[in-house]
A protein has these predicted regions:
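Helix N-cap/coil-helix junction residues
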Residues: 24-25, 59, 91-93, 121
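Juxtamembrane luminal stem/stalk of type II transmembrane Golgi/ER carbohydrate-processing enzymes
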Residues: 1-7, 212
Length: 217
């Protein structure tokens, strides 16, 4: 696959660059759970600029800040939302291009991931935090259960234990793809383990603006 080059990231770790390049499409769809602010440290703003659509949820009310975004923000505790109702009322297709999942309470990410996997929806790319650098509890309660579940559901871990450029040994996130929607040769080229995002992008020959990313961390 000829990867498309994206210059600027608004994500904490270049997740938006990764997603846009491997899917290589405009007008995709996303679901952002634990979305935080509308632009800085946001995984879907770059995608929106390229025609993507979707919904973003956060327990904190950022509705005033999100008025500048085209896509819908919902102030909601993701742990208590009716996912089937939420997804059915906002998506026409059962296949969503991108899921971004970032909850703050230990154990919540895996619990929410379980609920998502019980719905009739699936995703082409998933980025999910596990924060395993914080303690062994995060390894046992988040990272390992997340990996077991997603592998059982047919997802492939292409970038495990991703870290930020500034903190290359603080591994906090995994990047997954759905094996149904990518060919085996492409998937092989994306594999990495315990690498910082800038190293991953260099390996994939993706050009990007380092300052644009680092200024937002």
């Amino acid at each position: 696959m000829e990867l498309k080059k994206i210059m600027e990231s608004y994500s904490q770790c270049g997740q938006d660059i990764f997603v846009y390049n491997i899917l290589n499409k405009n007008n995709g769809t996303f679901l952002d759970l634990g979305c935080y602010l509308p632009k800085n440290i946001n995984n879907t703003y770059l995608l929106e600029l390229n025609g993507w659509s979707g919904i973003s949820l956060d327990i904190i009310d950022y509705s005033e800040e999100w008025k500048e975004r085209k896509n819908k923000f919902i102030q909601q505790d993701c742990m208590n939302v009716n996912l089937d109702e939420l997804l059915d009322s906002n998506y026409d297709n059962k296949v969503i291009d991108y899921l971004s999942l970032d909850m703050e309470v230990l154990g919540d990410r895996f619990k929410l991931l379980e609920k998502i996997m019980e719905t009739s929806y699936e995703f082409k790319v998933i980025t999910i935090e596990h924060d395993s650098y914080l303690s062994e509890d995060y390894v046992n309660v988040e990272k390992l259960p997340q990996r077991k579940l997603l592998k059982e559901k047919g997802y492939i871990l292409v970038c495990g234990d991703v870290s930020q450029k500034q903190y290359p040994t603080l591994f906090y996130e995994d990047w997954w793809v759905n094996s149904k929607y990518f060919n085996e040769e492409d998937i092989k080229t994306w594999f990495s383990d315990k690498l910082s995002c800038d190293t991953i992008f260099n390996k994939l020959n993706i050009n990007y603006n380092v300052n644009a990313i680092s200024e937002k961390w």
